[in-house]
Each structure stands twice: as structure tokens, then as C-alpha cells.
Regions:
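Secretory targeting and sorting signals
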Residues: 1-34
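Short alpha-helical segments used as structural interaction elements across diverse proteins
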Residues: 5-7, 56, 117
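Short, well-ordered surface patches within globular domains
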Residues: 39, 43-100
């Protein structure tokens, strides 16, 4: 009986310590950057310009009009990137976001667009009948999201181990 009570107290103490550590680490972007795998804890102004410029260069090649940066999409992307549920055990899309498209990458912001652009060959091979329900969509869907002509805005966020970009 005593060992059960002692174990319970230790478990509570350990949990409290871990939660307090999480609050400290979550207190600001630099705190995450110190313990990350070298990925930024948020999208810097330079990253923002590069993400937008690189995306628009790809869109231009596909005949799609340029898109603009949207702070609302960026804020939502940052919130999802900061949520441990977005990348614990693998990348997971925000099922609550249904106002456009969402791309996710375990690469940093400076590499994400080129990673998604690398799907162009699979996109071209899919032909003119793109079916987002087809299992092959995962091989070209990020590229497709970037070049959709009906999307006019984008915003991105980043945290330790994940970059999220949303398009609407």
C-alpha cells in the first residue's frame, strides 16, 4: 500500500516537472530553437519572403497567377505547427482546417517548397485527371496544392520538426 502511494506521488511529481518544462520550452520561439534538431521555431521574415517567392516561381511555370502572403493563414499554420499533435509520431494534418489546402514537411521552411516541387514529375504523370482520392495523390498532392489556380493566398508556420503551409 505504501509503495503504491509513493509511486503515485513520484508519478505526479515527474508529470508536474515535465509539464513545467513544456511550459518553459513553449514560452518563446528561441526556447524551442535551443533544443530543436536545427529547425527554426517559426517562420522568419526572410523565410516568409523565400516561401512566397519560391512558390510563385513554381506557380508561374504552371501558368498560375501569383499568390500573396496571408497573416491569418500564417497564424493558423503556426498554431498547428506548435501543436504537438501535428508531428508526434509522424506528420498529421489539421482535420479542423477545411478552408483550402495544407502542406506539411519535416524539413525547415527553406527546404519545404523545393521538397514539394520535387513532386512535379509524379504530378505530370498523373495526367489531366487528377483524383485527390487516388492513393497516388500522396506522391504529387503537395505540388498540386501549390499550383492550384484558384488559390490566391498562402501562409506558413514552423516549429521543431515541422513546417506547415496553408493555401486558400
Amino acid at each position: 500500500m505504501r509503495s503504491t502511494s509513493r509511486t503515485r506521488r513520484r508519478t505526479v511529481a515527474i508529470a508536474a516537472t515535465l509539464m513545467a518544462g513544456g511550459l518553459v520550452w513553449g514560452a518563446g520561439p528561441t526556447a524551442f530553437a535551443d533544443v530543436s534538431a536545427g529547425l527554426p521555431a517559426e517562420v522568419s521574415p526572410a523565410d516568409q519572403a523565400a516561401l512566397l517567392g519560391d512558390t510563385n516561381a513554381i506557380r508561374q511555370k504552371e501558368g498560375a497567377p501569383p499568390i500573396s502572403w496571408d497573416e491569418g493563414l500564417a497564424s493558423g499554420s503556426q498554431s498547428w505547427a506548435d501543436n504537438p499533435g501535428s508531428h508526434a509520431g509522424g506528420l498529421k494534418h489539421d482535420l479542423g482546417f477545411n478552408d483550402g489546402a495544407e502542406n506539411m514537411s519535416s524539413a525547415g521552411p527553406s527546404q519545404s517548397v523545393s521538397q514539394w516541387a520535387g513532386e512535379k514529375a509524379a504530378y505530370d504523370a498523373a495526367g489531366p485527371n487528377w483524383n485527390t482520392d487516388d492513393p497516388s495523390y500522396r506522391y504529387w498532392g503537395h505540388y498540386w496544392n501549390m499550383v492550384q489556380k484558384n488559390y490566391t493566398r498562402m501562409g506558413c508556420g514552423a516549429a521543431d520538426g515541422v513546417t506547415v503551409c496553408r493555401y486558400a
